[in-house]
Amino acid sequence: MAYEFEPRILGFLCNWCCYAGADLAGVSRYQYPTNMRIIRVMCSGRVDPAFILRAFSNGMDGVFVGGCWLGECHYVTEGNNEAFSVMHICKKLLKLIGVNPERLRLEWVSASQGIRFAEVITDFIKELKELGPLGTGEGIDTNGLKLKFEAVQSLVPYIKLVERERLRVHFETEDEYDKFFNSEEVDRLFRELIVDKLAISEILLLLRERPLSTGEISEILDLSPSEVSRYLNSSAKEGLVRFDEIQKCFVPA
């Protein structure tokens, strides 16, 4: 009998709308797969990037966030608008480390939309089955995937600072959010503020395991030797790494 992959999903559901919609789906006996484990949150805006990244690093094949429709948040802070921004940023981070961003999904479900909840969960699970297990579907080995998630998780406080200072916006429609976060300006900010930090974080994690030469780091991270040298020189100036003359390798400072 052929093995059929069943994705593991972690869902963060807004207490007031999506969670109530899920409850209605159950009471109404709408049929949908039971692959998702649910965490109820008071607002989708309270879902921290660290929660999402931790879920993936712990082996979840997909993460689902469900909230109120835009303009219908139960709080004056309009947390679902913030959730929309966080989702865009997390999708960019996943893409940056080689993970398919479609493994993360945000949907709006009201308390009266039990049938919609069943439909979006069924569709999400179908999509994840097509993508395959986390890592395997992307062609990333287990150790490489672990390294990438550890590196990006270590940057979460910095990423949240970047979001607050440079990427925090408030729009009325989804199209406006999509246009902003898919713009060349935001892509440029990501390259300038996050890409280098992530590469340095990966290098530091590797050096904690064992001393490595520039060539070895280049091969492991699939970076050019010149890029690795630039990152190592920058890290050395900050007192993070040093060159060991005896071993002829770089080690943590």
Where are these regions (language model features)?
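Iron-sulfur-associated redox domains of electron-transfer enzymes in respiratory
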Residues: 1-233
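Minor-groove-contacting beta-hairpin "wing" of winged helix-turn-helix DNA-binding domains
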Residues: 247-253
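A short, conserved structural fragment
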Residues: 236-247
